[in-house]
Amino acid sequence: MQLTEFNRFLKGLLQTALLAGLLSLSACETAPPVQEMSDARQAIAVAKEAGAADKAAFHLKAAEDYLESAEKALNDHEYSEARYDAKQAKAKALDALKASETSND
């Protein structure tokens, strides 16, 4: 009988330790999205050089808004959100680039 209680105690202790470990892992912040931020800035710069400010202003504005949001999230140490917004900024900048190149045809 005592062995069974001890086994239950060990099982509970193990479950608690496992849960604590999982919680600590989920609380860890990811690394800052340095590369994603750089990619977004470069894509916006290329789109501007291609004339997106005149030819694809809607897409360029969306890219700049996402980049601004990413910068705020980065400053707030919300790295997952910053990474997402930076990737969106790059995608919108590439849309602006494509739209500005299409309008040249």
Predicted regions located by residue number:
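Helix-capping and short linker residues that terminate individual alpha-solenoid repeat units
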Residues: 48, 52, 75, 94-95, ...
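Bacterial N-terminal signal peptides that target proteins for export
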Residues: 2-17
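Charged, low-complexity interaction regions
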Residues: 52, 79-82
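Amphipathic, heptad-repeat alpha-helical segments
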Residues: 29-60, 67
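Short, charge-rich amphipathic alpha-helical segments embedded
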Residues: 79-80, 90-105
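C-terminal motif of bacterial Sec signal peptides marking the signal peptidase cleavage site
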Residues: 24-27
